[in-house]
């Protein structure tokens, strides 16, 4: 599949028609973090539950200066009509308004550019549809995270929020987040930081787990 982005790549500054009008991507992002996520088709069951959950979590993303924007190969008109179903799924007033725009990529230009097409899933004309892709961009417009799911498996937007919190924390502090980490849990001190420097950087304390190897690389500190 042609196109695609690698970690560290700058997001293409594309223009697109959306449910809130025409946008230029870099202008849309501004100085914020951004999540661009694609789905296979409007008016389908898994996609409805996904965008419903994204809408529910939109205030949590906004609190962290994260903008959401969705994409599929459907038209703006379909996006707006489908938005009523999404709001109804969330037991809210069935309006056309969602807390994020949806891109109209019916010609598949962006899907090809960004490597979002799923060759195994096709529309009624035999053309590939967009996979369940998630791109997280930092304020520098660079790709910080990419996730790719098949059409049959819905994404966990609570996990995407957790990952964004980790990305923002580790962008500001010299720490890493361990397996199953949640906001507020202890974090790990980077192995490149010498012991004496770590004590100064993390006044809440550094706790080292003793290991059979004798190496002192498992170092924890309360979340800064």
Swiss-Prot record:
MJ33 or lithium;[(2R)-1-hexadecoxy-3-(2,2,2-trifluoroethoxy)propan-2-yl] methyl phosphate inhibits its phospholipase A2 activity. CI-976 or 2,2-Dimethyl-N-(2,4,6-trimethoxyphenyl)dodecanamide inhibits its lysophosphatidylcholine acyltransferase activity. GO terms for biological process: cell redox homeostasis; cellular oxidant detoxification; glycerophospholipid catabolic process; hydrogen peroxide catabolic process; positive regulation of mRNA splicing, via spliceosome; response to oxidative stress. SUPFAM superfamilies: Thioredoxin-like. The active site is at residues 47, 140. Its main location: cytoplasm. GO terms for molecular function: 1-acylglycerophosphocholine O-acyltransferase activity; cadherin binding; calcium-independent phospholipase A2 activity; glutathione peroxidase activity; identical protein binding; peroxidase activity; peroxiredoxin activity; phospholipase A2 activity. The modification Phosphothreonine is found at residues 44, 177. Thiol-specific peroxidase that catalyzes the reduction of hydrogen peroxide and organic hydroperoxides to water and alcohols, respectively. Can reduce H(2)O(2) and short chain organic, fatty acid, and phospholipid hydroperoxides. Also has phospholipase activity, can therefore either reduce the oxidized sn-2 fatty acyl group of phospholipids (peroxidase activity) or hydrolyze the sn-2 ester bond of phospholipids (phospholipase activity). These activities are dependent on binding to phospholipids at acidic pH and to oxidized phospholipds at cytosolic pH. This is Peroxiredoxin-6. The gene is PRDX6.
